[in-house]
Amino acid sequence: ILKRCRVEMLCTSDDLLADFTWHRQASLQPQNIIVKPSLRADSVISFTTPSFRDFVSQLAELSGIKIKCLEDYLNAIDIRLNLFSDAGCEYADHSLDAGFRFVPVLSGEASSLFGKLLQTGEISSVETVKLQSYILLFMGRCYARRNWNMQLHIGAKRDTNTLLRTRLGPAG
């Protein structure tokens, strides 16, 4: 289908924990289609979701870093970003559906907030905004070093076309 539609490049949307086996296999095919990952990095700042602890555990395992503090977390993220870069990634996408406020925070406070999050599994909404701000700034710097594009979807409206949703399901 891709060849018939004259697709030259296919960018997939992948979580930070993604495996690039499929990308490698696709690049070995003789169809002359470039397959690159793009990073969907929502999980990096999804502190209030029940799956965040699992995300941190999997990140630790895949990066080879035991995550005990914010510095460990950021180093583990950077290791994974290197793998994305090696696989040809040039785009990172962050969904901020609930909106976003940037609140500058110093590294010491961000470290304390992350430590609290690791210990208790909870931080307040104000603390969440601060930690998200700090980590998004870190991510932006990482992307800039790699010459990537960073997309922020702030307050995006989802599921707005009821006719398409009826015909196509959740993709509509």
Model features per residue range: what roles?
Residues 1-146:
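Metal-cofactor-binding active-site regions of metalloenzymes
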Residues 101-115, 134, 152-172:
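Catalytic core of soluble alpha/beta enzymes
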Residues 149:
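Residue-level detector of anion-binding/catalytic polar loops
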